[in-house]
Amino acid sequence: MNKPLNFRFAVLSDLHVALPETVWQNLARIHLVEVGIPALEVALDRISEEDIDFLLVPGDLTQHGEAANHAWIAERFARLPYPVYVIPGNHDIPVLEANEQSIAADEFPGFYRMFGYEDTSRPYYTHEILPSVRLIGLNSNTFDVDGKQVGRMDESQLQWLRQTLSKSQAAGDELVMVMIHHNVLEHLPNQSTQGMGQRYMLENAAELLDILRAYNVKMVFTGHLHIQDVAYQDGIYDITTGSLISYPHPFRVFQYQTDRYNRHWLQMESHHVESVPGWENLKEQTRELMGDRGESYLLQLLTQAPLNLSEAKAKELVPSLRYFWTAVAEGDAVFNFSEFPEAAREYFESFGTTTAIDNRALLPMGEGRSHRRERLVSAAR
């Protein structure tokens, strides 16, 4: 990309919108779907002050694919003064065929004609959203022969992507941005190989990454994992944004800019919904909620590979991990578990970072440059 570019956009992810009549009553749930709509309204009010060119929403717009919730979101986004682009998350098309609760998978594009899906015949798309800026919205939800949902891109979509990127490259100097729900780079230690994190990654991420690198695509925006994290590998950033209904209730605002030396940068600022009616101290309340309801998750982390601790030993460590996952979700975490057995200490401290780039950063987008995570600029300029 040699052309100077300067534009501004926002990212909201994993909204899990649920109208009151569709809310599931589940006392074990750690995600607060009850605040989904008011939190979205607060975020949209804040974003309206940012003078953005467009908004990206990388999936999980609804609680569980309810037609009423899809219709509500489409109507709400239609009233916004800037373009919005969406893609489906696993919660948006949880079933192949419609049932009493959820829409059929192939119905999703029809709800979002105004938000990327002018062609409703397939669940992925591309648009030149600004001069010399192309967005590709991908679908990471497929179904196996038994009708089970799988986080994977099928071959027809991969072939379409190759053709789309080839045409973009032939047409001239375009900046390409990609949006997909499942993570394509690891945001947690060994996420691609260990069970509890593996399901949040695209099964055939390596194949997708090979295609993106072949066409010099640098930016991928994901969701699904409900954490704030920026991962980088061999020229590609996977910027995943946390969920609006769980701690820390984040959204992001970006400024893509070109400096006087024709170097390209992506400036990122993260913001949080701090309060909604009935939840005046929202972040602290949901932090405690996750602490109260997170024991079973922590026990799984401790008793499964790679630690494989006994249940008795795991229960001894759980109280010290009460706020572990909220710290991971907030991003830029630094951990010190010096009182833990060595293997457990090393494992849990590996979820932290030595460089704070998950929330506020200036990320280099220069051609052909290789920046390791620890060398990235952590202060916006």
What is the predicted function of each stretch?
Residues A18-E21, Q63-E66, N90-A98, F143-D146, ...:
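Active-site environment of divalent metal-dependent phosphoester hydrolases
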Residues N6-T22, S132-T142, M177-M179, Y237-G242, ...:
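Active-site-proximal beta-strand elements of phosphoester/diester hydrolases
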Residues M1-H70:
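N-terminal active-site segment of His-dependent metallophosphoesterases
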Residues D45-F54, R134, K148-Y237, F324, ...:
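His/acidic metal-ligating clusters that form di-metal
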Residues A67, A71-S166, V253:
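Extended active-site neighborhood of metal-dependent phosphoesterases/phosphodiesterases
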Residues S13-P38, P94-Y117, D144-M153, S192-G197, ...:
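Acidic/histidine-rich helix-loop elements
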Residues N2-A10, R122, T126-S140, G172, ...:
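Beta-strand-turn-beta hairpins that frame and shape the catalytic cleft
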Residues M1-P4, G278-R381:
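Non-catalytic terminal accessory segments
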